[in-house]
């Protein structure tokens, strides 16, 4: 299997606090990784570095072999890398359908709008939300 995500020797400090020190990990295609630990262990910092919300002080983040360490979050998202926050909330200015479409379009690389819309329609039917699809 191909290595999809690789974190190489990532470190991050906040003033005098060492949040991450030499963190390395790799994910193969289809693999799932759980990051667990107590409050303050650096879990959110690691996810923020991987997703581009924070820049590491040292180390690299590779996506499908490409170094994305210095790319902004939106460029990483367009390459298929994003994150969900602990409290997931829909975008309030978008309808139910549009919120699902955001995930369908940007959650998978190279998904056409037609494929994404078909997926959204299936999800709306499966969840019973089709009657509320256009609600904000």
Language-model features, listed with the residues they occupy:
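The feature captures the beta-strand-to-loop junction immediately N-terminal to the Walker
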Residues: 36-38
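Helix-to-loop junction immediately C-terminal to a conserved catalytic motif
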Residues: 51
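ABC ATPase NBD coupling module
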Residues: 55, 67-87, 110-114
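ATP-binding/catalytic-site motifs of ATP-hydrolyzing domains
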Residues: 60-62, 66
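Short coil-to-helix segment of the ABC ATPase nucleotide-binding domain corresponding to the Q-loop/switch region
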Residues: 93-104
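Conserved ABC ATPase "signature" region
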Residues: 113-132
């Amino acid at each position: 299997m191909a290595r999809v995500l690789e974190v190489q020797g990532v470190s991050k400090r906040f003033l005098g606090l060492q949040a991450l020190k030499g963190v390395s990990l790799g994910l193969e295609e289809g693999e799932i990784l759980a990051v667990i630990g107590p409050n303050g262990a650096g879990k959110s910092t690691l996810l923020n570095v991987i997703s581009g919300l924070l820049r590491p002080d040292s180390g690299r983040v590779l996506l499908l072999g490409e170094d994305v360490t210095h790319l902004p979050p939106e460029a990483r998202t367009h390459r298929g890398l994003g994150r969900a926050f602990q409290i997931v909330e829909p975008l309030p200015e978008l309808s139910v359908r549009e919120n699902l479409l955001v995930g369908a379009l940007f959650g998978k690389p190279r998904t056409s709008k037609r494929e994404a819309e078909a997926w959204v329609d299936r999800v709306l039917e499966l969840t019973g939300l089709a009657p509320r699809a256009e609600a904000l």
